[in-house]
Amino acid sequence: MIYQNREEFKNANMFGEGAPNDGYARYFTGNSYLNPLVAPGQAPLFLANVTFEPGCRNNWHIHHAEKGGGQMLICTAGEGWYQEEGKEPVSLHEGSFVYIPAEVKHWHGAKADSWFSHISLEVPGEDCRNEWLEPVTDEVYGRL
């Protein structure tokens, strides 16, 4: 469901908007918010609800790992996009699930006309690290 009104979206976003995602703001076009569901190191998996304002998206990035690793997204509210390099974008909505293996260049974010949130799970592995790359240009995003 498309949410243009922030208050309506907040009511639908069952895992909460969280705080401005200032620590990662340089890797996003637009404003995002982060609500950790477990504290880092508290559980074997780090889980957080990430919220994107309309038009917000993260840069292209890769989750590297020597073994295992990657990322999973569980879409919780609103509508967004996911795209792997060289592939067509995938429309996301509440209930969508995306598994992103390690070493896959990709990006994800909100549609231009809707707030969007997903739970992000970092898949355990060996020597896991993220490589943040170039922004998704307005030209590329505008064609969606």
PLM feature spans:
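A short, N-terminal "cap"/entry segment at the start of jelly-roll beta-barrel domains
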Residues: 1-46, 129-144
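Short hydrophobic/aromatic-rich beta-strand segments that constitute the beta-sheet cores
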Residues: 34-35, 82, 118
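Short, conserved beta-strand element in jelly-roll/cupin
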Residues: 49-53, 64-82, 121-124
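Short beta-strand His + acidic residue motifs that chelate non-heme Fe in jelly-roll/DSBH
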Residues: 59-61, 82-83, 100, 105-112
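A short hydrophobic beta-strand segment most commonly corresponding to one strand
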Residues: 72, 99, 113-132
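Short acidic-glycine-tyrosine-enriched beta hairpin
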Residues: 86-103
